[in-house]
Design a protein with these regions (language model features):
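A compositional/biophysical signature of low hydrophobicity enriched in polar/charged and small residues
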Residues: 1-351
Length: 351
């Protein structure tokens, strides 16, 4: 899909500033309201961009992020294999995202403790083996304790679009983050009605407030009021994701490597913001990292890798060779994409 300059700027603005209304966004990125509305409607009509509302899971009692990826015996197409994997993860509430990149399975899951993780991992591996899908025993399942890890990107496509469209927002300061302590205080003291509305919003994030209200047997005003408060406190947030297969990307990279940090850095990763690395998922643990990135071509991949290597060598010493896996974005099959409702329901049940 070929985009005009205005379409590139507006698509980037929609992704970077999901919390702004149309008037605010028009002023922020410097385009006319009529142009913004026309292009936004076109993007949505063509399923290029999607609105989401996601919870702040970092304020809940989930302590471990699991990043699983494993080669499969064969590329997954429509049919029995896909049905098996879809059923596996649809019935697994801890996994919020699961994708297939050709012949590789990738999944992100949250767990309250190590016991829950081991129980779930056993069932996943058992299902893969039982259906002759697992290529070998060398599955990659790295655990990131959230208290000492940094999820720097969680399906945020801003930098992907900046690199692809050659956008350099040097003077941009982004949005102000909400105070996490207030969000945590709120999530632990929701009323019964607020819990019902929160689940209703997450179940149908694209649905207008009046339709959510009708499903929940409450008023539109109640839904709007509680949604506004939860957004302002940072209990939930708006986000936008793209269908990257429609935007001309040639390469998808899954990167993972282990390291020893240089210096006394206790938490977090290297400062790579100015590089505009085109990653949309990235996590840094105490001694390991994993990320997903998109590139328009191999030249862009090579340049980004050189820039990243220069910065990472000042941050850490790598242990062993990195896993650098390249795929065609067109081969992506999405089983789950940021489906947090089961995790939220379990949290609310326990609290």
């Amino acid at each position: 899909m070929r985009l005009s300059k205005n379409e590139m700027i507006i698509l980037w603005g929609l992704v970077k500033y999901p919390m702004l209304n149309d008037r605010q966004l028009s002023d922020r990125i410097g385009v006319r309201m009529s142009t913004l509305n026309a292009i936004k409607n076109k993007m949505k009509r063509n399923d290029v961009i999607f609105d989401r509302i996601i919870p702040n899971v970092e304020i809940m009692n989930y302590e471990i992020l699991s990043v699983l990826w494993t080669p499969l015996k064969r590329p997954i197409k429509k049919g029995k294999d896909l049905d098996i994997l879809t059923s596996l993860f649809k019935d697994h509430p801890n996994t919020y995202s699961a994708m297939i990149f050709g012949d590789t399975l990738f999944a992100l899951s949250l767990y309250k403790n190590y016991t829950d993780f081991r129980r779930a991992e056993y069932m996943i591996i058992k299902t893969l083996k039982g259906n002759d899908l697992l290529l070998n025993e060398n599955t990659h399942n790295t655990l990131y304790p959230l208290s000492i890890s940094q999820v720097s990107k969680n399906f945020d496509y801003t930098a992907v679009l900046e690199r692809a469209f050659d956008i350099d927002p040097t003077d941009d300061k982004g949005e102000i983050e909400a105070d996490p302590s207030k969000a945590k205080e709120k999530i632990f003291h929701l009323t019964r009605k607020e819990k019902t509305i929160l689940k209703g919003i997450l179940e149908a994030p694209d649905m207008p407030d009046n339709k959510i209200a009708a499903r929940l047997d409450t008023t539109r005003q109640a839904v709007a009021r509680h949604k506004k408060e939860l957004l302002e406190l940072g209990v939930i947030r708006k986000t936008r994701v793209i269908d990257y297969a429609k935007l001309g990307f040639d390469l998808l990279c899954l990167l993972e490597f282990h390291y020893n940090k240089i210096g006394a850095i206790e938490k977090g990763g290297p400062d790579v913001k100015k590089l505009h690395l085109p990653s949309f998922f990235a996590v840094y643990g105490n001694s390991e990292t994993a990320s997903l990135s998109l590139y328009m071509d191999f030249k862009q991949f090579t340049k980004s890798r050189e820039d990243y290597t220069e910065v990472i060598n000042r941050f850490c010493v790598q242990n062993g060779e990195p896993h650098v896996n390249l795929y065609s974005p067109a081969d992506t099959i999405t089983i789950k994409h940021q489906e947090y409702l089961p995790l939220v329901e379990q949290f609310l049940k326990d609290n």
